[in-house]
Curated annotation (Swiss-Prot):
The chain crosses the membrane at residues 25-45, 72-92, 96-116, 147-167, 169-189, 230-250, 276-296, 328-348. Pfam families: DUF898. Keywords: Cell inner membrane, Cell membrane, Membrane, Transmembrane, Transmembrane helix. This is Inner membrane protein YjgN.
Length: 395
């Protein structure tokens, strides 16, 4: 193993992705065929092969990443979770609802613990220049940030909206109440997302390591909330237009129902078919717009505040919301038109763009490359969690 990561430029190192769409297409095609033939059993191996191709073709200063996870480990994990789920349903259906719901509830409650163990496994299976990544954090804190806090915030938002609705309906009427409460709900969800994601960033950033070196991060909660609220507010104009287009449909359907002519609903749908399809289009467009803005805001906030080895190495993300938006639109539209055949090329194109806008800043020559000798945990919880791959929109 090399003792240092060699570099000509010790200040700014851009990730380079060398993957090819044609090769990735062959991998995806073989994976799809084998997954269909095996009725889905091959899916974990397919996932590992796709991820391994992405990792091994991603280089930092001419050093490729490595990914050593196995499809067998993921398959056993998914199988164990599936068995627990089936057993709980079987208990409910065969006269033991208390025991069945308890088992199912426990499975839901330990999802944060499984996410942590899944992150540990994925980190240990990822390496750069022979040095493995790692992840450790408090299980109690993970459960609070990933499960309890979001649930409590959503309950609090529901209570606040319910109390406000009692006032707005009496003062401004039904239409005003719907619009006002809709706007408040969007803002409230943005605030909840901002608080939750800021805690997740802190948990993940301060819990990760590269060999013997620790990552660290300081996230401004207000900045995270502002980014999430602005992302959610992009939904509002779409919601207004969709409501304007779809309101006549519901109004006419209610009138037909009151007149006892509900059977004419089919003809009514045909009459408003264009407006209904426009609503579907605007709905999916709104999702892409929100996803683009939210992903860019969170990714830039996370990477631009992340550091390694006592701030000697820092990271920078320069992706833009408009760049992400039009790329996602191209991915969805062309993938849909080609029935998914173009997706491998588009995925490689998107990953390459993300790599070009990700930099590592610092003197990599002086970074000691020594593995953390802590072995991979082999507990039952780890076995059941290896197939859990939590998605964080800021990575």
């Amino acid at each position: 193993m090399n003792n240092v990561i060699s570099s000509k430029d010790n200040h700014n190192h851009t990730l380079v992705f060398t993957g090819k769409g044609g090769k990735y297409f062959v991998i995806c095609l073989v994976n799809f065929l084998l997954t269909c033939i095996t009725l889905g059993i091959y899916a974990p191996w397919a996932m590992v092969k796709c991820r391994r191709y992405i990792y091994t073709n991603m280089t930092l200063n001419n050093q490729p990443f490595a990914y050593k996870a196995t499809g067998g480990a993921l398959f056993i994990s998914v199988l164990l979770v599936f068995i627990i789920y089936i057993v709980s349903l079987s208990l409910i259906e065969h006269g033991h609802p208390g025991l069945g719901f308890t088992l199912f509830g426990l499975l839901i409650a330990i999802i944060p613990f499984m996410a942590v163990k899944g992150l540990q496994y994925q980190a240990m299976m990822t390496s750069l220049n022979g040095v493995h990544f790692g992840f450790q954090c408090s299980m109690r804190r993970a459960w609070w940030y990933m499960f309890a806090l979001p649930v409590l915030l959503m309950v609090a938002l529901y209570i606040v909206l319910y109390i406000i609705s009692l006032v707005t309906i009496a003062v401004g009427g039904l239409v005003f109440s719907i619009v006002f409460l809709g706007l408040l709900a969007i803002i409230g969800i943005g605030v909840i997302n901002g608080i939750t994601y800021s805690k997740w960033m802190t948990l993940f950033g301060n819990g990760a390591n590269f060999g013997i070196h620790r990552f660290s991060i300081q996230v401004n909660v207000k900045t995270c909330i502002r980014g999430c609220v602005l992302a959610m507010l992009t939904l509002f104009p779409f919601a207004v237009v969709i409501g304007y287009l779809i309101a006549p449909v519901f109004t006419d359907m209610i009138l037909l129902s009151m007149m006892g002519n509900a059977q004419a609903g089919g003809a009514l749908i045909l009459q408003y078919y264009g407006q209904i399809m426009a609503c579907y289009f605007l709905y999916f467009l709104a999702i892409i717009v929100v996803t683009s803005y939210l992903y860019v805001a969170l990714r830039n906030l996370f990477l631009n505040n992340l550091s390694l080895a006592n701030d000697s190495i820092r990271f920078h993300s320069s992706v833009t919301a408009h760049g992400m938006l039009w790329r996602l639109l191209v991915v969805f539209v062309i993938s849909g038109v080609t029935l998914g055949l173009a997706y491998p090329w588009l995925k490689i194109w998107l990953v390459s763009w993300l790599a070009q806008n990700t930099q590592v800043q610092g003197d990599l020559d002086s970074l000691e490359l020594t593995n953390d000798e802590k072995p991979l945990e082999n507990s039952p919880l780890m076995w059941i969690s290896r197939g859990i791959m939590p998605y964080f929109p800021f990575i």
